[in-house]
C-alpha cells in the first residue's frame, strides 16, 4: 500500500524562486557596498548582513526569498542592511571571503553579520546556510533575532 506524501510544511524555506534571477551583479563593487552599508547602519542603528553567493546557486535564491518574506523579511527590513557579495565561480571577492572567514568549501550561500563598526559578529563557517531550501523559517527568524540590534542599544 502506497503512503500518501506528506503535505509541504509552511515552515520550510523552500518556496517559489522566481522574479529576481540576478541577485549578484557582475559589476557590483562589494567592498564599496559594504562600506556604504556600514555608514548607513551607524546612522540607522542596524547590523549589516552579508550574503556570499552566486546567481547559479539555487539555495542563494531560496535564502534571498526568505529574507524578504514573512517574519524574517520584517526583521531584515527593520534591523539589518543586506549586501550580496558575488563569489562568481569561487574566486571573485577573495579578499572579502578571507576577511569575513567564509570557507567556500562548505558551500554557499554563506552569511556574515557585522556591527555598524564593521566588526565581524558571526560567520557561517560550517556551511550552516548551504542547504537553505531545507531550513525552517522559524530557525531563520531565531537566527536574525539573535543578531539584530536590540531597541535602545547602539550598534
Residue ranges and their predicted role:
Residues 4-44, 152:
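N-terminal leader/targeting and pre-domain segments
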Residues 21-28, 83, 129-133:
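Second-shell loop/turn segments in exported
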Residues 28, 52, 65, 69-94:
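Thiol-based oxidoreductase modules, predominantly thioredoxin-like and allied folds used
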Residues 42-43, 74-77, 102-107, 116:
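Extracellular/periplasmic catalytic domains that process cell-envelope and extracellular macromolecules
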Residues 44-57:
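Short active-site neighborhood of thiol/selenol oxidoreductases, capturing the structured segment around
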Residues 48-51, 81-85, 110-114, 121-123:
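Structural recognition of the beta-strand scaffold that forms the well-ordered cores
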Residues 55-59, 66, 87-92, 118-120, ...:
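Solvent-exposed loop/turn segments at secondary-structure junctions
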Amino acid at each position: 500500500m502506497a503512503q500518501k506524501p506528506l503535505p509541504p510544511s509552511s515552515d520550510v524555506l523552500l518556496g517559489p524562486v522566481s522574479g529576481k534571477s540576478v541577485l549578484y551583479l557582475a559589476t557590483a563593487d562589494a567592498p564599496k557596498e559594504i562600506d556604504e552599508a556600514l555608514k548607513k547602519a551607524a546612522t540607522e542603528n542596524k547590523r549589516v548582513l552579508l550574503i556570499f553567493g552566486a546567481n547559479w546557486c539555487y539555495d542563494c535564491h531560496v535564502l534571498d526569498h526568505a529574507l524578504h518574506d514573512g517574519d524574517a523579511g520584517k526583521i531584515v527590513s527593520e534591523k539589518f542592511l543586506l549586501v550580496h557579495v558575488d563569489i562568481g565561480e569561487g574566486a571573485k571577492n577573495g579578499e572579502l571571503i578571507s576577511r569575513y572567514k567564509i570557507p567556500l568549501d562548505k558551500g554557499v550561500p554563506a552569511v556574515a553579520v557585522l556591527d555598524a563598526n564593521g566588526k565581524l559578529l558571526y560567520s557561517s563557517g560550517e556551511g550552516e546556510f548551504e542547504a537553505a531550501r531545507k531550513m525552517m523559517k522559524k530557525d531563520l527568524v531565531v537566527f536574525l533575532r539573535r543578531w539584530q540590534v536590540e531597541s535602545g542599544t547602539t550598534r
